[in-house]
Amino acid sequence: MKIHSSDHSWLLLAVLVILLSFSGALSSDDKEKKTKSVDKKKEVTYDGTSLIINGNRELLYSGSIHYPRSTPEMWPNIIKRAKQGGLNTIQTYVFWNVHEPEQGKFNFSGRADLVKFIKLIEKNGLYVTLRLGPFIQAEWTHGGLPYWLREVPGIFFRTDNEPFKEHTERYVKVVLDMMKEEKLFASQGGPIILGQIENEYSAVQRAYKEDGLNYIKWASKLVHSMDLGIPWVMCKQNDAPDPMINACNGRHCGDTFPGPNKDNKPSLWTENWTTQFRVFGDPPAQRSVEDIAYSVARFFSKNGTHVNYYMYHGGTNFGRTSAHYVTTRYYDDAPLDEFGLEREPKYGHLKHLHNALNLCKKALLWGQPRVEKPSNETEIRYYEQPGTKVCAAFLANNNTEAAEKIKFRGKEYLIPHRSISILPDCKTVVYNTGEIISHHTSRNFMKSKKANKNFDFKVFTESVPSKIKGDSFIPVELYGLTKDESDYGWYTTSFKIDDNDLSKKKGGKPNLRIASLGHALHVWLNGEYLGNGHGSHEEKSFVFQKPVTLKEGENHLTMLGVLTGFPDSGSYMEHRYTGPRSVSILGLGSGTLDLTEENKWGNKVGMEGERLGIHAEEGLKKVKWEKASGKEPGMTWYQTYFDAPESQSAAAIRMNGMGKGLIWVNGEGVGRYWMSFLSPLGQPTQIEYHIPRSFLKPKKNLLVIFEEEPNVKPELIDFVIVNRDTVCSYIGENYTPSVRHWTRKNDQVQAITDDVHLTANLKCSGTKKISAVEFASFGNPNGTCGNFTLGSCNAPVSKKVVEKYCLGKAECVIPVNKSTFEQDKKDSCPKVEKKLAVQVKCGRDKKN
């Protein structure tokens, strides 16, 4: 049929109107479905440069956040803050012993709701890296492997062992099939772009020889055979079999990583440790943000395109989930602290780094790399596309003590000691790893007024058994005895002493000697408490030895073996042993009496209070509680009630006056505490213990404590609210202005404003405002946030200037230059290079 041109135009118009009408008639749900269907599936591939998502090369900034270490109520805010910190990916382990604590019985609810966690990440527009295990280490009890696995006949963990492979394959398929059913893989339109099987296997591979290599090949084939449409990695595994990508773990992968084992694989950094995990008995340990930023900039300057901060938020080892001797608080010095609060300047300085690297994105992903070495201490690495304006440079000064000058393309740059300056156009410095522009915060633990009202502690003391029926001829190994059902295992034995044994010898009383493989031990003889002993994370074995008074006839020895978690690393974990190994009486008239193999031993697992569940409301009435006298022996349960701390700030309990034990709030396990194990500085490693708000009710919250040690003072315990309302700035007058002043447009770096200058930015959290300026000095002040002092040079008007810019505001910006702080245009110390130190207090408006 032939159509005239006028008719043709009319027909096109009619069709267009119909289509528009149809589109307008779609429901909002239909529109959403239509939008989602457009970009539903994502193809993830890779080459020697980067991961490629839907045909687009990506720079990936990832952070480790472990779902069981925070509560579902905390997840949204933590993920949101991670995104605001410049991350585009979240990495998590999958915890086998969380999901399958009993063989064949899976749990994916509450803090174990992996699907919910991943969907929240997806909702925030972030990618996911799923580190599947089966072994994860992670300072988590048993490295994430369930206890029951130890009791599978003929099993050897993490090697070419059929029972282990059989259970691993079953577990892996349960998890991956669940992810697939929920359409969470990128190939299905979900957020999971990368997977990991096994973890740092090279650390144990030599112990298993050929079986170790066979196991790694088997693990690789297992996940690739499931055809999930994502790449897979193995970290610290340089011989990772194709197509597996070998990735780096460590603090300085830009210098320590030998690179991918094939040219067609990208350089990925799966763990950049943001601090050092803590164990009981440790002094404080930190890693500076300057060092982290330096390491990341160096890695990206040397072909790296993916970094993961381990941890970005550490969280809490609730209940008994920490590995041996590891504190309840985990990676608290990460960019988001244990409570999910932004730890500044670590959070902000890394955010600025991500901004700077994004300005370099085109050059890093498509440019040709070049390297120049002006001196032994300096290095220039740059990427450019010939014939275009695309160019980015990294000027590195590796001198740890002094600044160095670097001449690049006709211009001289002064680079501070051990730092890297980033030039996203090969001309303009927008960021230096050693110059912190972001604000600082100091964390405050404020005693709660509501929660600390007249504690009325009641107590229940465990009976110490003198004789448990049993026929073992040696003390049973403690891991196998407790089976991860309790931290505690009782051991009893009896022995006879005659008059000849008690005859006086030079050297005084006989000595009881107990050699233990760990972790801690309490000892009674004939009902009298003799004391306790313990090992450490570095040296688990210890000896308990003490002079004792024996009686003629039968004597009764009772020992309580104590665990602080299962081991989380090493080869042959299924054969790792702990607990008392040899027991003897030295100095008897007849010589040494060996009780280890010549006596029958009785054993019992756990406390009566654990068996009855008296840590929760429904179990309280199963025992008789008495009013606390203040002279309780060890092995005592304490309970009281308290109201929730005021405000919605994070909450914690401070365990002053206590020794060692476990804490529950409303039946929820807060974790292990150990106040009596002091660091070399003479202080407990951890004092405050996080109580998530979701554990609390407005009133009458049940606090239950099991305390191992005698003579404690529970009246010294208090509840605190946690904030970061102390906000500071510490900026040198010659620092590089914030990267936020810059953007990239048409392959060029351009200033967002006409006036690019250095400023100090202070910001309160939430709806709070700056209520006081506690310190201000433009000169050469000393100290850190929360502890500043004046130096020899100080502009007298410093505090007045800061108050003018900041008081009563939620956020303020202070110009950092001489003209702002000069009085009558006079510089009282012109030869001093100035720094501005400011400390303010944030608070809520009293009217509110």
UniProtKB/Swiss-Prot annotation:
GO cellular component terms listed in the entry, alphabetical order: apoplast
SUEL-type lectin domain residues: 754-843
Cellular localization per UniProt: Secreted, Extracellular space, Apoplast
Glycosylation sites: N107, N272, N303, N376, N398, N782, N787, N817
Keyword Kinase included in the entry's annotation: no
Active site (UniProt): E200 (proton donor), E271 (nucleophile)
GO MF term set: beta-galactosidase activity; carbohydrate binding
Protein family: Belongs to the glycosyl hydrolase 35 family.
Protein name per Swiss-Prot or TrEMBL: Beta-galactosidase 13
Upper classification of the organism: Eukaryota, Viridiplantae, Streptophyta, Embryophyta, Tracheophyta
Originating gene: BGAL13
